[in-house]
C-alpha cells in the first residue's frame, strides 16, 4: 500500500496512457458469492451466477488484481483473456456459474490486515461488461461502477479486524443482502445511529464524535429515509468526484459538512462536473466565474455566455431546476451548449 500522492497518482498516469473501453453487458448477475482474505493484499474468490448462458462473458476488474484461474460450476478451468481492466471468459462448458480466483492491490483503495477501504464505486470484484473505470475529464478520478440494478450478495471476509459493510451482517464478517454495489471498510471505526440510520466514522479523527455527527446529519437523515447507512471515509488523496458517492440505500462521504450539497454532487457524472463548477462559481465566486470564461474547456467556454444569460433571468429558480435535472440525468448526453440553447429557446417560446 502506497498512500503517498505519487503512489495514488499512479492510477491517473496509468489511465492517461491506456485506452478505456465501454461495452454494456449482454447478461445480468443473478448473484455474487464473494470470499475475501485480507493479509498483505487482497486474495479473493468470486462465484458469479448469471441470468443467461453466454459463449463469452465480459467483466471489468481493476488491473491491479491478477487472475490466478477461472472455473465453471463443475470446477473445470475456463480459458480467458485479460487486457488492462477488461476480462473476457470463454464459456466452453455452457455454464451459468463462473468462479474467478484473483489477488492483488490498489494504492488508493487499499485492503490489508491493518485496514480496508473498498468503496462501492470501485471494481474490486468483477463488474459485468466493459466499463470505463477512471474519468479523464476535467474532473479526474474513479467513476461509479455500481450496477444499474440490485442483485443478491453473499460475502465472507477473512480478516484480523472487524469489517463494516453496506449489507446486513449475518455473523462476524459475513454479510448478505440485495444491493447495487458492495462497500467494505475496516480500521478504527465507531458507529452512531440516528433515526435507524447507522453512521460509521473514524474515531481517531477529532472532527467526528456522536454529538457533531448528530448535529450535522440529523436533518439530512430525516429527509432521506432510504439511506440506511452512511460511511465517513478517509480523505486520503481523493479526487473531487471520489469525495462522495450515493448508492441505492447507502452513502459514502469524506465530509459531513454541507451534506445536502454533497449528496446532490455525488449524482453528477464526471463529464458534467465542469458545468456544475461554473454554476457554483456564478452564484458564489464571481471572480472565479470570470476566470472560467477563458480558462476552461472549449465546450464550457462555448456554453458560458448562454449559461450566464439564463441565470441572470432566472427570477423564480425554475431554469436552475431544469439545469440541475440535466446534471444528474446520466442518460442525457447532450453537450452543455446543446442543452442550454434548448433551455433558452424553451423559455423564449413560453
Predicted feature descriptions by range:
Residues 56-77, 119, 152-163:
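Solvent-exposed beta-hairpin/edge-strand motifs
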Residues 313-350:
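Pan-zinc metallopeptidase signature
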Residues 42-52:
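Short, well-ordered beta-strand segments enriched in hydrophobic/aromatic residues
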Residues 1-41, 346-347:
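N-terminal, polar/Ser/Thr-rich
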Residues 64-118:
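A surface-exposed beta-strand-loop module
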Residues 107-110, 155, 191-277, 281:
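Juxtacatalytic substrate-recognition/specificity segment
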Amino acid at each position: 500500500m502506497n498512500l503517498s500522492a505519487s503512489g495514488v497518482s499512479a492510477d491517473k498516469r496509468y489511465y492517461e496512457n491506456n485506452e478505456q473501453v465501454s461495452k454494456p453487458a449482454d447478461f445480468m448477475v443473478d448473484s455474487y458469492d464473494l470470499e475475501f482474505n485480507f493479509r498483505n493484499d487482497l486474495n479473493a474468490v468470486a462465484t458469479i451466477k448469471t441470468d443467461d448462458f453466454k459463449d463469452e462473458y465480459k467483466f471489468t476488474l481493476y488491473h491491479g488484481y491478477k487472475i490466478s484461474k477461472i472455473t465453471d460450476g463443475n470446477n473445470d478451468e475456463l480459458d480467458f483473456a485479460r487486457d488492462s481492466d477488461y476480462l473476457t471468459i470463454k464459456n466452453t462448458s455452457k455454464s451459468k456459474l463462473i468462479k474467478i480466483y484473483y489477488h492483488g492491490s490498489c494504492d488508493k483503495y487499499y485492503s490489508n490486515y491493518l485496514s480496508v477501504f473498498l468503496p462501492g464505486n470501485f471494481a474490486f470484484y468483477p463488474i459485468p461488461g466493459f466499463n470505463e473505470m477512471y474519468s479523464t475529464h476535467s474532473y479526474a478520478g474513479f467513476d461509479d461502477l455500481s450496477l444499474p440494478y440490485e442483485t443478491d450478495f453473499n460475502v465472507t471476509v477473512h480478516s484480523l479486524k472487524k469489517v463494516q459493510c453496506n449489507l446486513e451482517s449475518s455473523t462476524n464478517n459475513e454479510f448478505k443482502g440485495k444491493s447495487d454495489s458492495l462497500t467494505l471498510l475496516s480500521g478504527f471505526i465507531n458507529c452512531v445511529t440516528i433515526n435507524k440510520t447507522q453512521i460509521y466514522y473514524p474515531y481517531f479523527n477529532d472532527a467526528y464524535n456522536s454529538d457533531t455527527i448528530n448535529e450535522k446529519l440529523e436533518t439530512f437523515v430525516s429527509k432521506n429515509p432510504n439511506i440506511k447507512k452512511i460511511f465517513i471515509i478517509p480523505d486520503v488523496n481523493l479526487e473531487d468526484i471520489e469525495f462522495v458517492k450515493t448508492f441505492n440505500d447507502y452513502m459514502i462521504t469524506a465530509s459531513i459538512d454541507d451534506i445536502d450539497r454533497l449528496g446532490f454532487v455525488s449524482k453528477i457524472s464526471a463529464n458534467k462536473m465542469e458545468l456544475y463548477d461554473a454554476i457554483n462559481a456564478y452564484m458564489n465566486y464571481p471572480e472565479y466565474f470570470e476566470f472560467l470564461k477563458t480558462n476552461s474547456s472549449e465546450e464550457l467556454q462555448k456554453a458560458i455566455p448562454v449559461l450566464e444569460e439564463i441565470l441572470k433571468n432566472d427570477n423564480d429558480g425554475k431554469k436552475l431546476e431544469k439545469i440541475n435535472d440535466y446534471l444528474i440525468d446520466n442518460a442525457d448526453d447532450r453537450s452543455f451548449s446543446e442543452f442550454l440553447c434548448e433551455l433558452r429557446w424553451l423559455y423564449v417560446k413560453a
